[in-house]
Regions:
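Phosphate-binding beta-alpha-beta segment of Rossmann-like dinucleotide-binding domains, i.e.
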Residues: 99-101, 107-158, 170-173, 192
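A short helix->loop->beta-strand "cap" motif at the edges of active sites that frequently abuts
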Residues: 75-79, 99-101, 180, 239-241, ...
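Phosphate-coordination loops involved in phosphoryl transfer and adenosine-cofactor binding
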Residues: 5, 78, 155-158, 240
């Protein structure tokens, strides 16, 4: 490989890379979206990189990096990719390693925002706020307490966290202030973290779900976690349980979730993520849009966002790209879990 091109290309989602240029003086920073004038494809990316070599890429969530795309990028001299976000399920890590490329992410942004959003969704479910929305009988039904018969006291509720990284721990901290009894399952967290956080660690998914009043998902999407919450897992939750997901949609088998909601086995669900976004042809989304799921709340993958977190993410991603260009050790290289 020859000398690394001192150019950074933002591959998707973003327009003018003004903040990135501030972070990387002396480095040419371009937006693929601005260059091609439409939502970029992998073919657009490869064509532009061949014409205008880039040493590092900043990738958001819309571009998928397959084995063939990564091999071609490696041959074109791309040293590495920084995923502007926490998850990296749109990058084939094995193929990236084979191509000699370093993949990084930005795990230390937006933690508070996602944790706050998860708590808001959790409270929406447990306080039955879907039933509090004005309907055709409003205001005649103003004092109809039957709509709130399922509301449970938060103090002592068993909150199950699937995944106990930065965000999971931030949710635990917030939930404890409400009096939740927090338990969690994450085989990748070092031993003893339960003592530090004054929570309960369990050793299996079954132990996590059995008897839980609420399940909140905070794990990465991988082949190990894809559809981890399926019909069998949902059946372990008690009939009054609620589910919140601010991680990745495909961790849940959405057809099984829809069936559990329609049968009444689950009391409520609030999701910031779906398996495919935008959710074209998604049965769960379609039923929600038709008003068939009053105990469901969907938000459009915005848990990560605040004005401050958006700036934080872009600056940190750009700084990591700069380290890749200069051949310095990156701060957040992604490793392949075995």
């Amino acid at each position: 490989m020859g000398q690394t091109a001192m150019r950074v290309l933002v591959t998707d989602f973003m327009g003018e890379p003004d903040l990135e240029r501030e972070v990387l003086p002396g480095v040419e920073v371009e937006s693929l979206l601005m260059l091609v004038g439409h939502a970029p494809t992998p073919a657009d990316l490869l064509r532009v990189v061949e014409e205008r070599p880039a040493g590092a890429l900043i990738a958001w969530h819309e571009m998928v990096f397959s084995a063939s795309t990564l091999a071609a990028l490696g041959r074109a001299g791309v040293r590495g990719i920084v995923r502007a976000g926490v998850g990296y399920d749109n990058v084939d890590l094995e193929a990236a390693r084979a191509a000699g490329m370093t993949i990084c992410n930005v795990p230390d942004y937006g933690t508070d925002e996602v944790a706050d959003h998860a708590m808001a969704l959790l409270l929406w479910c447990l306080r039955c706020l879907g039933g509090a929305s004005p309907g055709a009988a409003w205001p005649q039904s103003w004092r109809d307490a039957g709509r709130f018969a399922a509301v449970r006291r938060l103090q002592g509720c068993a909150l199950a966290l699937l995944g106990f990284g930065r965000i999971g721990q931030a949710v635990a901290h917030r939930a404890q202030a409400f009096g939740f009894d927090v338990r969690w399952y994450d085989p990748y967290v070092p031993r003893g973290q339960d003592k530090v956080t004054r929570t309960t660690r369990v050793e299996s998914l079954r132990d996590l779900l059995t008897g839980a009043d609420a399940l909140s998902i905070h794990c990465l999407l991988s082949e190990e976690t894809r559809h981890l919450i399926d019909a069998q897992a949902l059946a372990l939750l008690p009939p009054h349980a609620v589910l919140v997901n601010t991680a990745r949609g495909a961790v849940i088998d959405e057809s099984a979730l829809l069936a559990a909601l329609r049968s009444g086995h689950l009391a409520a669900a609030a999701l910031d993520v779906l398996s495919h976004e935008p959710p074209v042809g998604n049965a769960l989304y379609d039923a929600y849009s038709r008003g068939e799921l009053p105990s469901v709340l969907l938000t459009p993958h915005v848990a990560w966002y605040s004005q401050q977190s958006a700036v934080d993410l872009r600056r940190k991603a750009a700084a990591e790209a700069g380290r890749l260009l200069r051949g310095e050790p990156p701060w957040n290289p992604v490793t392949i879990r075995r």
